[in-house]
């Protein structure tokens, strides 16, 4: 008891240092949060470690200091409940600190050695799960002495509060020693690997400027809303600073807490007794490491924030004005065809669609009634890359009824000219099992074989909505149909304004794969009248004034349109040989001054419109 009476002399120092550590760690957490726009795994682990230090000096160390000061009075002594609370909280926070430092070093090694795998493996979620596991294991093991896992012959709370592991019990002491020793060893190994890899990369970057870098990838939906993002490679200076900070934290912890706790625990278990110097060593080391962590955070320029930034962060937190960060990293590989810089703004109206003929396109699927046209632009390493997630991909869990899951756009009831674009996308889309069933183009797979005319140039004649096939009565009595709920095949016709003699969508060497079909023979047809363009359909006498009745059948136009369909239109040279130089250039006019897009003009393709 005389040795324990020397402990109250250090209680005042513990309280003062504990108060300073509490304020410093709180400032460190605010500084890290103010310097970062969103929470990242490494910053999250640093803040968790600082919060663990705050709890350690606020609960067990403060409790022990106050009790030691109160013990100077003869009428006060430790009781069983207070001693159990102190032992459980102290060892819980000691183990949590040890595991947090090891997790910090492991995440840094993972990020430095395997940067792509680290960014694609949802490291943020793994860091959260790691912290939850750390606290669960630490609490379960440290709470066992309070419920009976201790030496029953002489309990640790009978004479004062002897919290060294040898006084608690042999089983608890061995488990605690193994956990702390293994965690310290793993932290040292991970830190050494991360430091070596960082220095090697720095030397390699100086020797080779073409070092591999991970691009910053931002995931957005079809409406442009940011869903998630993947951070790119760190700059050389930032990477070196962060690795140096983690190395310093691990080194200081091992020197001030890891190895001293191992030495004290092993010595007490070997001697089966505890000494006053053991309690003094463990408590002072805990306070010292809690004081040094904010100093290291302030020394790193990446996490050093001024008073103004911290004040703005606090005001944003109190006003709940901070944007909600629901972004999560991708949980797997990224399909290369989804990596886009941005989606193309497409125009819609009447019988034309605006296209940029200087870009290469692919018509992915009908989402919301119109094909989405994406420019395939070359990836740039110094810019963010964007992933476009279509609505049906996001609602893939409810693809039984895609019309109920995806809100229909306002222009969908006007299915007349919109279906022309649908059939156009059907012609150039590749057929096969890779087509998504949730897409609106799935109606083409359910059609009878008589409608599957993708290999013939006359399939361009199937551009007519089903509402016109049923006559004026059916068009008035029934709402406009959708591609998935359209009735079976029937005689259909199309406007001649969409039929050029040569289908020049873009530069032919950049055409989609569906347009690269081998040339096939076409049936002979009467020649075009004199004075008319070979690729232009002859205008019937009644075409100047449209009749309100239904359009004529497709067979009535086939004969007049076949002369303009060249048998060699699948070859690059066939674009000029089919209808001369006028038809190809008139199909895509020059870009306008306002938008810069080329426009499909119906008056240059025929006179039926």
Curated annotation (Swiss-Prot):
One Gene Ontology cellular component: plasma membrane
Side Extracellular, residues: 1-11, 63-84, 148-175, 265-276
Subcellular location: Cell membrane
Alphabetized Pfam families for the sequence: 7tm_1
Gene Ontology molecular function: any one: G protein-coupled receptor activity
Record's compositionally biased regions (Low complexity): 458-479, 527-536, 584-596
Cysteine disulfide partners in this protein: none
Alphabetized UniProt keyword annotations: Cell membrane, G-protein coupled receptor, Membrane, Receptor, Transducer, Transmembrane, Transmembrane helix
Biased segments, Gly residues type: 571-583
Residues that span the membrane, as ranges: 12-32, 42-62, 85-105, 127-147, 176-196, 244-264, 277-297
Ranges in the topological domain labelled Cytoplasmic: 33-41, 106-126, 197-243, 298-609
Membrane topology: Multi-pass membrane protein
Annotated region (Disordered), positions in chain: 446-496, 514-609
Protein task: Orphan receptor.
UniProt family annotation: Belongs to the G-protein coupled receptor 1 family.
Protein name, UniProt field: Probable G-protein coupled receptor 153
Gene behind this protein: GPR153
């Amino acid at each position: 008891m005389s040795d324990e009476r020397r402990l109250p002399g250090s209680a005042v120092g513990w309280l003062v240092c504990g108060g300073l550590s509490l304020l410093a760690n709180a400032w460190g957490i605010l500084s890290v949060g103010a310097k970062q726009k969103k929470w990242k795994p490494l910053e999250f682990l640093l803040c968790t470690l600082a919060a663990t230090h705050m709890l350690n000096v606020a609960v067990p160390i403060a409790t022990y200091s106050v009790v030691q000061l109160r013990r100077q009075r003869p009428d006060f002594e430790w009781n069983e409940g207070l001693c159990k609370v102190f032992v459980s909280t102290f060892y819980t926070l000691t183990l949590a600190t040890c595991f947090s430092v090891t997790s910090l070093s492991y995440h840094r090694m993972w990020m430095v050695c395997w940067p792509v795998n680290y960014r694609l493996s949802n490291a943020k979620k793994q860091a959260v799960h790691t912290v939850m596991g750390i606290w669960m294991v630490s609490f379960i093991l440290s709470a066992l002495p309070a419920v009976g896992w201790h030496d029953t012959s002489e309990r640790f709370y009978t004479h004062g509060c002897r919290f060294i592991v040898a006084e608690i019990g042999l089983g608890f002491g061995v488990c605690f020693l193994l956990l702390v020793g293994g965690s310290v060893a793993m932290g040292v190994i991970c830190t050494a690997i991360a430091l070596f890899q960082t220095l090697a990369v720095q030397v390699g970057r100086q020797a080779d400027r073409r070092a591999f870098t991970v691009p910053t990838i931002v995931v957005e939906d079809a409406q442009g809303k940011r869903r998630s993002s993947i951070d790119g490679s760190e700059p050389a200076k930032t990477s070196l600073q962060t690795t140096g900070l983690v190395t310093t934290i691990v080194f200081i912890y091992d020197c001030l807490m890891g190895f001293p706790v191992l030495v004290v625990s092993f010595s007490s278990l070997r001697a089966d007794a505890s000494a006053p110097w053991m309690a003094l060593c463990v408590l002072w080391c805990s306070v010292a490491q809690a004081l040094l962590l904010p100093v290291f955070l302030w020394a790193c320029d990446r996490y050093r924030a001024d008073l103004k930034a911290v004040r703005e962060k606090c005001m944003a937190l109190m006003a709940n004005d901070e944007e909600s960060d629901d972004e999560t990293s991708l949980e797997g590989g990224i399909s290369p065809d989804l990596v886009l810089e941005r989606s193309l703004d497409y125009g819609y109206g009447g019988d034309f669609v605006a296209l940029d003929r200087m870009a290469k396109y692919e018509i992915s699927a009908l989402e919301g009634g119109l094909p989405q046209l994406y420019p395939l632009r070359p990836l740039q390493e110094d810019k963010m890359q964007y992933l476009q997630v279509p609505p049906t991909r996001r609602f893939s869990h409810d693809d039984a009824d895609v019309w109920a899951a995806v809100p229909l756009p306002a222009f969908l009831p006007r299915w007349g000219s919109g279906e022309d674009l649908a059939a156009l996308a059907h012609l150039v889309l590749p057929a096969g099992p890779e087509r998504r069933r949730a897409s609106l183009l799935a109606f083409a797979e359910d059609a009878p074989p008589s409608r599957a005319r993708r290999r013939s140039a006359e399939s361009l004649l199937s551009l007519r909505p089903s509402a016109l096939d049923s006559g004026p009565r059916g068009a008035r009595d029934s709402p406009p149909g959708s591609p998935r709920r359209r009735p079976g095949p029937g005689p259909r016709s199309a406007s001649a304004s969409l039929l050029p003699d040569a289908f020049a969508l873009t530069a032919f060497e950049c055409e989609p794969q569906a347009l690269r079909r081998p040339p096939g023979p076409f049936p002979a047809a009467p020649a075009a009248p004199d004075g008319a363009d070979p690729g232009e359909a002859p205008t019937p006498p009644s075409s100047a004034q449209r009749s309100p009745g239904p359009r004529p059948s497709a067979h009535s136009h086939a004969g007049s349109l076949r002369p303009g369909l060249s048998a060699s239109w699948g070859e690059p040279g066939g674009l000029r040989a089919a209808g001369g130089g006028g038809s190809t250039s008139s199909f895509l006019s020059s870009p306008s001054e306002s938008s810069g897009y080329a426009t499909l003009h119906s008056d240059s393709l025929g006179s039926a419109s």
